[in-house]
Amino acid sequence: MYLRSIMRGVIERVQLPFVIHIRKLSSEMPDGGLYPAPDHIVEPWIPPYEERKNEPVEIKRARLLYQSRKRGMLENCLLLSTFAKKFLHSMTPLQLDQYDRLINLPSNDWDIYNWSVGVKPTPEEFETEVMDMLKSM
């Protein structure tokens, strides 16, 4: 009780102004655009996707389940792992190939997320039965 009254007195006496700090990224220009990357910064090389033609179906399912869970961003980890849990076990070999291309061809995970939630239009090459299933979730 004594401690509570002391704390109440301190809180009532100390009226600090509320300050909001706005943090800007170092890559942002004053007009809101992004500064061009300096010449000494090199984008990492991403090896091209190679389709695994003779992979057994059960091995492919296990690999796709793992890849669905271990993405580069939390949103896709949640979205794709939930999708895989619901649909992966019943997919046909053609659907497995479509899903494999969908999660491994685009180099940007945000593209997959934006297509699946309808923020951006899906490119024709990824507008498949599997993408329809993903959008229906």
Swiss-Prot record:
Key word Amino-acid biosynthesis present: no
Quaternary structure and interacting proteins, as annotated: Interacts with the flavoprotein subunit within the SDH catalytic dimer.
Highest rank taxon of the organism: Eukaryota
GO cellular component, one term: mitochondrion
Alphabetic keyword roster: Chaperone, Mitochondrion
Job description of the protein: Plays an essential role in the assembly of succinate dehydrogenase (SDH), an enzyme complex (also referred to as respiratory complex II) that is a component of both the tricarboxylic acid (TCA) cycle and the mitochondrial electron transport chain, and which couples the oxidation of succinate to fumarate with the reduction of ubiquinone (coenzyme Q) to ubiquinol. Required for flavinylation (covalent attachment of FAD) of the flavoprotein subunit of the SDH catalytic dimer.
UniProt xrefs under Gene3D superfamilies: Flavinator of succinate dehydrogenase
The family this protein is said to belong to: Belongs to the SDHAF2 family.
Misc remark: This protein may be expected to contain an N-terminal transit peptide but none has been predicted.
InterPro entries noted in UniProt: SDH, SDH_sf, SDHAF2
GO biological process terms, semicolon-separated: mitochondrial electron transport, succinate to ubiquinone; mitochondrial respiratory chain complex II assembly; protein-FAD linkage; tricarboxylic acid cycle
Key word Chloroplast present: no
Disulfide bonding pattern of the chain: none
Protein's recorded name: Succinate dehydrogenase assembly factor 2, mitochondrial
A Pfam family this chain is assigned to: Sdh5
Compartments, record wording: Mitochondrion matrix
